[in-house]
């Protein structure tokens, strides 16, 4: 290489050093000073990994003094280049010697890097292009946000997430029965809202006992890093902001924190996009006296655009409280309780019509009349004829039924604000088998009851009933000895024998009180050394998590977990299938919640429910009412709350007084009313609600698409190649899993999310679901997203030179492959990416400037190419510069044409989708007040904003590859 003092060169291996200057040429060695970093490098003159920097006419370059010149011509004098051109500020003619060039010039544009000899390996060009295609594919997918979470592909959960998560500021009550996965539904919606940019700031309000569980669940299943806020965290946050809630984007807190006036005011002022309230059945309301908890959530719901309320028991605090929760979501719609009741009464006709449409039978006249009346603003006669015709194929008839059913769901009832799936509509649950074990009443309890009766304590009936259900509490009150009762209680003897005979089984034990749970643990430990752990409301979150983990542990873990009523709320242990009810709660909803700890989707075995009880006591009578009256042990009982309210007085009387005639009468009345309510529920609103909530065939089609996405081998191959290029160590661990570790040769100094110890990953959903310690990799996972960002955000793969060995073409034939990115910058919340995401535009030019991209696809072209040594590649580029410059200009013309068409297509797609959605919602608003005006306004504004951003779309050359034909 000819070197001369003052020449400017760049290091091929250390481009970060900037422009180097030749300061010494001696014998076979050359020394360069890199003024930007102050470092010297000595190279062999014959093999120096250096590229001479010579700019071309049309380039604008910066001088060392800070001014710029637009080059018009070059002059070479004494082996140094002098640039002549126009001063960028004064517009005067100036000259600039190459020694006076800025030391900090970076070759960021692909064409500059190519001409400066900064040429990447062939495979990196391909990986960069694949990364851009992957990002484009993900951005345009309507499944964005649903593919990545570590959850099972359960139809009703994914359907609700798809329906609700795609809305602007969704305001919804998720009220699936216990065990159907409301937390997962909420997590899917949160994940989707975040990934699509519909929400950025999210507040989750949960009972104090569930804060840590939500934190772990959001991270483990959804890769979302929430922060738990309590009073201490709020005080700490003052160092960063006067309002502690502004210090994090994703926050979990308890209702108790917000009971403090100052904290509530700060939360109200914190500009949330979405609020999630778990266990919303605790929000009690009456027109005269709404609870403090209700008023807290109401204050937030008035300023937060999106609200999700989660409850398994909508009517637990009465129908008024259920109405009040709907009122939180839409106060304009649910303004009057009496009007709400009157509307509910009309649901029967709607449900009958929906039932008729959902069955593959001929529509009866009554159903046709109902449909005609209910959809009076729409001409449904053609659809009815299609359904009733014998000459039409089944697929067309089914489509007509689905269309009418959707019209019905859209126009009537609470379908857009309330989702409730029942076990009757969701398959895959195990059986519940009830086992009762009677025992004689111990003499000590009999004596305690007699003494209590003689003392004539004036207790309210409900308090007397509660006392009768827990004789050990009464005994303790007299004996003042909290531990001794377990030494003679036959239920404890039975419990010990049961655990001894089921040593290999995990057993969940639930009792009403924390004191009872602690006493039982002491009994098991001291009498038989049985490994058990407790779980109650007085324990810290960390202590409860440790207890839960100890119970879940296969080897050396606890055989039994003993929970109190409140302590077990919201916790799930479906890896166990034996449930022991040490006592019974005086509320059928609480009984269902107990059983729901095991009876959940994901339970692999039939559930064995065991109840040891004391014969001829209130315990036996309550057991009979639950079992014979409600069948509440073996089936879920949606009407349990209503029945309890109706028969509470009679039930409490029976519990307090042993009167078999009264008991028989109560059972007869309960059974009769149970059947009535069951029939009414089957005929009424619930059927329509379930059709809307589980999604039917549309939900199944959604699951099919998600499953196909899981099995996309092309995606898996692309991700593995991405990690190869970055330099991540990959060790096959078997069982569908790989261990990823950072290596010494990684392309980037750090890879966020990949720590030094490594991480075990899988592309298989089932493996991820069975192993919490293995990360589930999809294109939505942060490790993949970060990898894509590392490549596309750097200069990796922006230049390449390759040889095409093809004797059908003349040797020396040149092709120029250009990858442009079409991009319209806009806030994520506009949803512009749905119509015009960053889009790769490929241009493949021959030496005459003809674009052959449509005729020669990327994959087949890429397979025929061979790599070229970087120094040879640099020489080939320099020799081809006279051809390349006009080709670059021609390529940009083709790319601009493609961009224009992209914008036209994107605008048409946006107009079609959003106008269609707007017209649909406007039509529905006329007949269904559930459609909120702000939803319509959001769509109108979205159309205006997106159009403006599309008009400002930009083109940027992202990568360039020069290809030469060779016969060698």
UniProtKB/Swiss-Prot annotation:
Annotated CDD domains: DEXDc_RapA (cd18011), SF2_C_SNF (cd18793)
Domain Helicase C-terminal: 491-655
Record-linked Pfam families: Helicase_C, RapA_C, SNF2-rel_dom, Tudor_1_RapA, Tudor_RapA
Lineage top rank: taxon: Bacteria
Functional note: Transcription regulator that activates transcription by stimulating RNA polymerase (RNAP) recycling in case of stress conditions such as supercoiled DNA or high salt concentrations. Probably acts by releasing the RNAP, when it is trapped or immobilized on tightly supercoiled DNA. Does not activate transcription on linear DNA. Probably not involved in DNA repair.
Protein EC: 3.6.4.-
Organism listed in the record: Shewanella frigidimarina (strain NCIMB 400)
Subunit relationships: Interacts with the RNAP. Has a higher affinity for the core RNAP than for the holoenzyme. Its ATPase activity is stimulated by binding to RNAP.
PANTHER family cross-referenced by the UniProt entry: DNA ANNEALING HELICASE AND ENDONUCLEASE ZRANB3 FAMILY MEMBER (PTHR45766), SWI_SNF-RELATED MATRIX-ASSOCIATED ACTIN-DEPENDENT REGULATOR OF CHROMATIN SUBFAMILY A-LIKE PROTEIN 1 (PTHR45766:SF6)
Record protein name field: RNA polymerase-associated protein RapA
Annotated binding of ATP, by residue: 176-183
The family this protein is said to belong to: Belongs to the SNF2/RAD54 helicase family. RapA subfamily.
GO biological process: regulation of DNA-templated transcription
Lineage, broadest ranks: Bacteria, Pseudomonadati, Pseudomonadota, Gammaproteobacteria, Alteromonadales
Gene Ontology molecular function, alphabetical: ATP binding; DNA binding; helicase activity; hydrolase activity, acting on acid anhydrides
Segments forming domain Helicase ATP-binding: 163-332
Keyword annotations from UniProtKB, A to Z: Activator, ATP-binding, DNA-binding, Helicase, Hydrolase, Nucleotide-binding, Transcription, Transcription regulation
Motif DEAH box: chain residues: 278-281
């Amino acid at each position: 290489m000819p070197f001369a003092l003052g020449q400017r060169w760049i290091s091929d291996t250390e481009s970060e050093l900037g422009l180097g200057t030749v300061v010494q040429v001696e014998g076979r060695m050359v020394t360069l000073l890199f003024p930007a970093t102050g470092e010297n490098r000595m190279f062999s003159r014959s093999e120096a990994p250096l590229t001479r920097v010579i700019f071309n006419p049309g380039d604008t370059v910066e001088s060392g003094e800070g001014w710029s010149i637009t080059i018009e011509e070059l002059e070479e004098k004494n082996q140094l280049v002098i640039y002549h051109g126009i001063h960028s500020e004064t517009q005067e003619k100036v000259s600039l010697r190459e020694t006076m060039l800025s030391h900090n010039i970076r070759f960021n544009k692909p064409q500059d890097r190519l001409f400066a000899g900064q040429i990447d390996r062939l495979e990196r060009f391909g990986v960069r292009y694949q990364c851009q295609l992957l990002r484009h594919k993900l951005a345009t997918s309507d499944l964005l946000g649903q593919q990545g979470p570590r959850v099972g592909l359960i139809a009703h959960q994914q359907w609700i997430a798809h329906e609700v998560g795609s809305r602007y500021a969704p305001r919804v009550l998720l009220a699936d029965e216990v065990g159907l996965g409301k937390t997962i539904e909420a997590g899917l919606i949160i994940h989707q809202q975040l990934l699509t940019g519909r929400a950025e700031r999210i507040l989750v309000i949960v009972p104090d006992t569930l804060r840590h569980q939500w934190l772990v669940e959001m991270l483990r299943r959804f890769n979302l890093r929430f922060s738990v806020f309590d009073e201490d965290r709020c005080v700490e946050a003052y160092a960063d902001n006067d309002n502690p809630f502004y210090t994090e984007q994703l926050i979990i807190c308890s209702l108790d924190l917000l009971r403090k006036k100052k904290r509530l005011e700060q939360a109200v002022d914190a500009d949330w996009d979405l609020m999630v309230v778990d266990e919303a059945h605790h929000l009690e309301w009456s027109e005269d006296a709404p609870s403090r908890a209700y008023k807290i959530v109401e204050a937030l719901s008035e300023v937060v655009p999106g609200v999700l309320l989660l409850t398994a028991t909508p009517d637990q605090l009465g129908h008024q409280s259920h109405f009040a929760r709907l009122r939180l979501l839409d106060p304009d719609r649910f303004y009057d309780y009496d009007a709400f009741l009157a509307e509910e009464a009309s649901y029967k006709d709607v449900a009958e019509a929906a039932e008729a449409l959902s069955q593959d039978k001929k529509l009866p006249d009554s159903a046709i009349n109902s449909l005609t009346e209910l959809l009076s603003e729409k001409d449904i006669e053609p659809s009815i004829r299609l359904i009733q015709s014998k000459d039409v194929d089944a697929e067309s008839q089914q489509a007509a039924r689905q269309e009418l059913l959707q019209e019905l769901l859209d126009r009537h009832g609470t379908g857009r604000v309330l989702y409730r799936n029942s076990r009757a509509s969701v398959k895959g649950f195990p059986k519940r088998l009830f086992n009762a074990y009677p025992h004689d009443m111990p003499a000590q309890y009999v004596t305690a009851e007699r003494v209590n009766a003689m003392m004539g304590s004036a207790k309210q009936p409900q308090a007397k009933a509660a006392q009768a259900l827990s004789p050990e509490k009464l005994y303790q009150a007299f004996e003042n000895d909290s531990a001794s009762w377990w030494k003679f209680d036959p239920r404890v003897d039975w419990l010990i024998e049961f655990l001894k005979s089921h040593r290999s089984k995990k057993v969940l034990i639930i009792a009403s009180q924390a004191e009872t749970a602690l006493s039982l643990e002491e009994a098991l430990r001291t009498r038989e050394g049985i490994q058990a752990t407790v779980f109650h409301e007085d324990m810290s979150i960390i202590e409860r998590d440790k207890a839960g983990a100890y119970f879940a542990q296969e080897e050396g873990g606890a055989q039994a977990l003993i929970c109190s009523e409140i302590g077990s709320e919201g916790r799930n242990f479906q890896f166990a299938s034996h449930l022991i009810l040490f006592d019974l709660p005086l509320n059928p909803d609480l009984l269902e919640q107990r059983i729901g700890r095991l009876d959940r989707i994901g339970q692999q075995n039939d559930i064995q429910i065991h109840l040891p009880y004391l014969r001829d006591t209130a315990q036996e009578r309550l057991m009979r009412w639950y079992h014979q009256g409600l069948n509440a042990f073996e089936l879920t009982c949606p009407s349990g709350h209503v029945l309890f309210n109706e028969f509470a007085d009679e039930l409490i009387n029976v519990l307090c007084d042993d009167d078999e005639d009264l008991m028989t009468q109560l059972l007869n009345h309960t059974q009769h009313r149970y059947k009535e309510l069951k029939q009414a529920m089957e005929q009424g609103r619930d059927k329509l609600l379930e059709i809307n909530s589980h999604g039917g065939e549309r939900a199944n089609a959604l699951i099919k698409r998600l499953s196909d996405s899981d099995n996309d081998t092309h995606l898996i191959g692309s991700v593995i190649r991405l990690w190869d290029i970055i330099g991540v160590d990959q060790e096959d661990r078997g069982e569908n899993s790989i261990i990823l570790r950072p290596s010494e040769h990684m392309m980037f100094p750090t890879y966020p999310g990949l720590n030094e110890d490594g991480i075990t990953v899988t592309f298989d959903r089932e493996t991820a679901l069975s192993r919490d310690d293995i990360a589930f990799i999809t294109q939505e996972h942060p490790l993949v997203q970060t990898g894509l960002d590392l490549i596309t955000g750097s200069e990796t793969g922006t230049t390449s030179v390759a040889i095409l060995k093809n004797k059908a073409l003349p040797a020396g034939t040149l092709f120029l492959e250009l990858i442009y990115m079409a991009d319209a910058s806009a806030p994520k919340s506009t949803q512009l990416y749905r119509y015009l995401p960053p889009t790769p535009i490929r241009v493949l030019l021959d030496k005459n400037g003809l674009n052959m991209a449509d005729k020669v696809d990327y994959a087949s072209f890429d397979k025929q190419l061979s790599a070229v040594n970087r120094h040879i590649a640099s020489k080939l580029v320099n020799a081809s510069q006279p051809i390349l410059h006009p080709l670059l200009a021609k390529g940009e013309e083709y790319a601009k044409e493609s961009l224009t068409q992209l914008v036209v297509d994107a605008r048409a797609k946006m107009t079609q989708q959003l106008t269609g959605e707007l017209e649909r919602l406007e039509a529905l608003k006329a007949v269904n007040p559930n459609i909120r005006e702000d939803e319509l306004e959001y769509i109108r504004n979205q159309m205006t904003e997106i159009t403006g951003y599309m008009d400002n779309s930009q083109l940027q050359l992202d990568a360039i590859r020069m290809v030469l034909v060779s016969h060698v």
